[in-house]
């Protein structure tokens, strides 16, 4: 893989996420690619074309609590109680992806319905086409250090239009610190983690695993490390629940 990202460069928000080993959007092999007539997808040029439903695609690159899959025992941040021995449904997400913003609330609801049945988790996959996806993922990691991963994730999804186009490092950093303050976080600690060189490691780990299992875009739903076809941001909560149970062999 490529060398670790410089933390200051990350916060500029202008370095391609390809530095994480990611590649451009628009894989023709993915169901959620720009060639799929039934979905809205974002092309490699960064422009979105809309039709019936939605996900942003990329060529292969790779309250919630941390938990630890086949790569190193890590399965992502948990959206429900851990069920030892049960299957795991995972959402690969990009906080700048508008389709992830639509998918994640339904994923959260599905997690509630699957509590005690399946493990439901989320992992990072910042796309090359979204210049501030990596800084946003860093903000989520910095919030998780104080137990507020989900709160920061939801804040970023709700305010995408406010930060997605910011290119000045200091302005983006200040805004994310403002969000941390709104969420009741210790901003000094938040900023320290935001700038720490190690904070990118879980993002890199998630992307590496996404590459390994064939994730091609966001949002992508995976059950037991197998990409689930037929689901995207337009899928209902009931569709998510029934599909996850079927793929996991749960009646």
Regions found by a protein language model. Name each.
Residues 90-96, 101-175:
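Structural alpha/beta surface segment adjacent to cysteine/selenocysteine redox centers
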Residues 2-129, 243-251:
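Extracytoplasmic thiol/disulfide redox context detector
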Residues 141, 178, 208:
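Surface-exposed charge patches
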Residues 79-81, 163, 228:
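Short clusters of hydrophobic/aromatic residues that line enzyme substrate/ligand-binding pockets
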Residues 22, 149-153, 187:
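Internal amphipathic alpha-helical segments of the cytochrome P450 catalytic fold
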Residues 2-5, 9, 27-37, 181-251:
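C-terminal cap of thioredoxin/glutaredoxin-like
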């Amino acid at each position: 893989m490529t060398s670790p990202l410089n933390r200051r460069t990350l916060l500029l928000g202008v370095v391609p996420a390809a530095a994480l080993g990611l590649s451009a959007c628009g894989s023709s092999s993915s169901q959620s690619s720009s060639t799929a007539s039934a979905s809205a997808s974002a092309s490699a040029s960064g422009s979105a074309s809309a039709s019936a439903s939605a996900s942003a695609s990329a060529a292969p690159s790779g309250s919630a609590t941390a938990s630890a899959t086949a790569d190193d025992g890590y399965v992502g941040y948990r959206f429900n109680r851990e069920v030892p021995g049960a299957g795991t449904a995972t959402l690969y997400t990009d906080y700048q992806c508008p389709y992830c913003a639509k998918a994640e609330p339904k994923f959260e609801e599905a997690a509630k319905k699957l509590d005690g049945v399946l493990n439901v988790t989320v992992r990072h996959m910042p796309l090359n086409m979204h210049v501030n996806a990596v800084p946003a993922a860093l903000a989520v990691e910095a919030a998780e250090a104080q137990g507020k991963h989900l709160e920061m994730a939801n804040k970023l999804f709700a305010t995408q239009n406010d930060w997605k186009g910011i290119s000045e490092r200091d302005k983006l950093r200040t805004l994310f610190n403002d969000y941390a303050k709104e969420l009741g976080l210790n901003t000094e600690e938040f900023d320290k983690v935001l700038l720490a060189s190690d904070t990118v490691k879980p993002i890199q780990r998630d992307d590496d695993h996404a590459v390994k299992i064939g994730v091609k875009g966001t949002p992508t739903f995976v059950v037991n490390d197998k990409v689930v076809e037929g689901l995207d941001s337009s899928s209902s909560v009931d569709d998510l629940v029934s599909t996850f149970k079927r793929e996991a062999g749960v009646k």
